[in-house]
Amino acid sequence: MSRRVEFDLSTEDHSDRRRTNTFSSSADEDGVPNEVADYLVYFSRMVDEQNVPEILTLYDQAFPDLTERFFRDRMWPDENVVERIIGPGNKLFIILYKELYYRQLYARNTRGPLLVHRYESFMNYQELFSELLSSKDPIPLSLPNVWLWDIIDEFVYQFQAFCLYKANPGKRNADEVEDLINIEENQNAWNIYPVLNILYSLLSKSQIVEQLKALKEKRNPDSVADEFGQSDLYFKLGYFALIGLLRTHVLLGDYHQALKTVQYVDIDPKGIYNTVPTCLVTLHYFVGFSHLMMRNYGEATKMFVNCLLYIQRTKSVQNQQPSKKNFQYDVIGKTWDQLFHLLAICLAIQPQRIDESIASQLSERCGERMMHMANGNIDEFRNAFATGCPKFLSPTTVVYEGVNQSKEPLLRQTQSFLEGIESQMALPVLRGYLKLYTTLPTKKLASFMDVDDEHYDSFIGKLLTYKMIVNELGKEAGPSSADDDEPQTDIDFYVDRDMINIADTKVARHVGEHFIRHIQKLQEVQDVLKRLDIQKP
């Protein structure tokens, strides 16, 4: 349990204290403990004062602590009770409180909340984003990075949950069928179009794409941003909305658009996403998965390994903060195992050097499975994919009665994945033979692999397929990590008429070149700083 947080109300004037006592009496009548009432009053005041460090403590520590102590078996008070406690004129705080309320409702119902609660939660999100997007001037609101990310992440999650819910008749009772029919006819809740519209509107309002592009081109982002783009709140919401869109496009099976969405996001240790652990994991997981589905196995491997290394480094933090583990780190624990199975797929098709600590854990977890995959066992590929992939969705599928169809998108994506794998089943064996030679006649290699004359042309096609994988075609489709010029595979080759020429590309690391590259980067940064027009104080 996290440490208890005391709420200092001593700075209130006499009228504030008198008002608080009045609301505390009201809270007693509503069955709300005085400590919770004090928390809500103080929380509202901190949001109004834009005290971000204190808001972070109240959100990240106090809320889970009070939930554990007072609301393990019941819900937090509804908005009417909260409004009586904190007083009128706090519309934005009530909306933010309801976002927390419905998020807790989703978290504690294993079968999912009732349809009415799903609908009300969407209406609350719509009201929140309407407040932010329809204002003529930037809203004077400051929230911690983790809360801003959680708002976007939960919004996408609830959309995903609703799509799975309406495709599964077993998740609702008879009374909800008529309400679902009405919602679908009017398309006024959790429809794909308003969801995408909200996310893209956040991108447009914040000019986040233009700003990230300017940063990538070493230009001043303020030159392409208006007052909304220069607002810390809108910039961060737009940034997190990019990653929310990445996730949404992957769930819909549009991997090219997913990577295009984050093409200007620099995946480096100083990215904004790095301030929120679950955001970092989400970004790496979905970028890596997109590369996997587009058969860019080298890029996918980089994403998965970097993410696993990050989780490995932060495990001690998770263990020391059990209250956070239930809320912030839940997604990290679930993704940890998924990443290993996806990494196993990549390395079975395209072996390469990875961090030794990750390689050791991968061998323990998936060593036998990888051996079967390398030998062409298609069922092992299917099982690894099913374990590692996200829960795909079909936004237009509605089943009012009959068989559950929520897994149909998964079956389609699995079939698409396996079709690509089946065309590459011979590649691990092919690589094994190529490693033994520096030159090798194509006819001789074909005989090694029991390829007769009738299938010789298709065999040459497999050679070209493997060459494409080695060259990582399509790498430019998304963000990549540093040191891309260092070879990741241990062989390369080319075909000259009927002869295969093979080169061993496993080279020692050149430490000097590493420092030279970073010195050049430092010089580039210094040049950019010199060009910036910064007025001296």
From Swiss-Prot:
Major subcellular location class: cytoplasm
Gene Ontology CC: one annotated term: eukaryotic 43S preinitiation complex
Protein biosynthesis recorded as keyword: yes
One Pfam family per UniProt: Paf67
Keywords assigned: Cytoplasm, Initiation factor, Protein biosynthesis
GO molecular function ontology, one term from the record: translation initiation factor activity
Biological process annotations from GO: formation of cytoplasmic translation initiation complex; translational initiation
Signal peptide: none
UniProt cross-references to InterPro entries, sorted A to Z: eIF3l, PCI_dom
PROSITE patterns: PCI
Transmembrane segments: none
HAMAP family (alphabetical): eIF3l
Family: Belongs to the eIF-3 subunit L family.
Alphabetical list of PANTHER family matching this protein: EUKARYOTIC TRANSLATION INITIATION FACTOR 3 (PTHR13242), EUKARYOTIC TRANSLATION INITIATION FACTOR 3 SUBUNIT L (PTHR13242:SF0)
Task performed by this protein: Component of the eukaryotic translation initiation factor 3 (eIF-3) complex, which is involved in protein synthesis of a specialized repertoire of mRNAs and, together with other initiation factors, stimulates binding of mRNA and methionyl-tRNAi to the 40S ribosome. The eIF-3 complex specifically targets and initiates translation of a subset of mRNAs involved in cell proliferation.
Subunit (UniProt): Component of the eukaryotic translation initiation factor 3 (eIF-3) complex.
Name of the molecule in the record: Eukaryotic translation initiation factor 3 subunit L
Taxonomic lineage of the native organism: Eukaryota, Metazoa, Ecdysozoa, Nematoda, Chromadorea
